[in-house]
């Protein structure tokens, strides 16, 4: 079921991208968008996890190097009926974690040195359960493709804008639409793409919280961890790329600007409240 959902979303986002390309650039725009969509989906599927791990200097560790962390990941992966993911550690004081990998067979769990320092074993289990839920649901692949397509739509709109400014339009020859429609799509399409990306990311965070709590065995493990991580991430800066912020369990960016309205993460208070309500039903 999760594989089917992933495929459907990939197709939907790609078709939307091609549709935007056709409205902005006619047949040539649609063709260009199709080629870009195929290339980006291929690249995101096979290489995105390697890039993000290298971006943060993550180092793979063995059981001998991080026995407690490794034991937690292995035990919870078995409980979730997942293959053992690779375990990585990021040298960063900000307590945070993320999962990556295109499928459960290629799963990776990465945690910072900071998170291992401030969380108890139970809280760390809550975090690992959350990340394993992302792997089980193939959320990382979906989020990566959504972010890639959203960025590409913005790029396509910018290209079209500069082409109109410096090159004019030849709609009759190229099969493009009305110039006003194209102009509106240049403005609206990136916003629509961003909203789709945020909706996908936020809904999947809630689902990973709930399923991760079940994997860990107690929703309060994760709710307590989130409370600590939220305040620590605000106090301890991390040199994080905004394009990968959606991958982390809590937003690694400061979030003290208007961009907080467009956060890829649901409000931390709501996440904690949901988990505490879940704990009362246990």
UniProtKB/Swiss-Prot annotation:
GO function terms (MF aspect): metalloendopeptidase activity; zinc ion binding
Transmembrane segments: 6-26, 29-49, 140-160, 180-200
Protein's cellular compartments: Cell inner membrane
Family annotation (InterPro entries): HtpX_protease, Pept_M48_protease_HtpX, Peptidase_M48
Residues holding Zn(2+): 130, 134, 205
Keywords: Cell inner membrane, Cell membrane, Hydrolase, Membrane, Metal-binding, Metalloprotease, Protease, Transmembrane, Transmembrane helix, Zinc
Keyword Cell inner membrane annotated: yes
One GO BP: proteolysis
Cofactor note (record): Binds 1 zinc ion per subunit.
Signal peptide: none
Cofactor field: Zn(2+)
EC number: 3.4.24.-
Family: Belongs to the peptidase M48B family.
PANTHER family the UniProt entry points to: PROTEASE HTPX
Protein name stated in the entry: Protease HtpX homolog
Source organism of this protein record: Thermodesulfovibrio yellowstonii (strain ATCC 51303 / DSM 11347 / YP87)
Lineage of the organism: Bacteria, Pseudomonadati, Nitrospirota, Thermodesulfovibrionia, Thermodesulfovibrionales
Primary gene name: htpX
């Amino acid at each position: 079921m999760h594989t089917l959902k992933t495929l459907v979303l990939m197709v939907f986002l790609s078709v939307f991208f091609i549709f935007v390309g056709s409205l902005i650039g006619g047949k040539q725009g649609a063709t260009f968008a199709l080629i870009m969509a195929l290339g980006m989906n291929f690249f995101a599927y096979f290489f995105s996890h390697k890039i993000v791990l290298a971006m943060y200097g993550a180092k793979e560790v063995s059981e001998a190097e991080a026995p407690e962390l490794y034991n937690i990941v292995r035990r919870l992966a078995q409980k979730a009926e997942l293959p053992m993911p690779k375990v990585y550690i990021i040298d960063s004081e900000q307590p945070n974690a993320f999962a990556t990998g295109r499928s459960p067979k290629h799963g990776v769990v990465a945690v910072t040195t900071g998170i291992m320092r401030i969380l108890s074993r139970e809280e760390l289990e809550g975090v690992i359960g959350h990340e394993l839920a992302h792997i089980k649901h193939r959320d990382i692949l979906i989020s990566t493709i959504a972010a890639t397509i959203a960025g590409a739509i913005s790029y396509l709109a910018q290209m079209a804008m500069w082409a109109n400014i410096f090159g004019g339009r030849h709609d009759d020859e190229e099969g493009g639409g009305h110039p006003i429609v194209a102009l509106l799509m240049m403005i609206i399409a990136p916003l629509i793409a961003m909203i789709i990306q945020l909706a996908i990311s936020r809904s999947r965070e809630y689902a990973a919280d709930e399923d991760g709590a079940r994997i860990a065995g107690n929703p309060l493990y994760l709710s307590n961890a989130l409370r600590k991580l939220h305040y620590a991430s605000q106090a301890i800066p991390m040199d994080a790329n905004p394009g990968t912020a959606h991958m982390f369990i809590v937003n690694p960016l400061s979030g003290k600007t208007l961009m907080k309205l467009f956060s890829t993460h649901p409000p931390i208070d709501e996440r904690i409240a949901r988990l505490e309500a879940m704990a009362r039903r246990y």
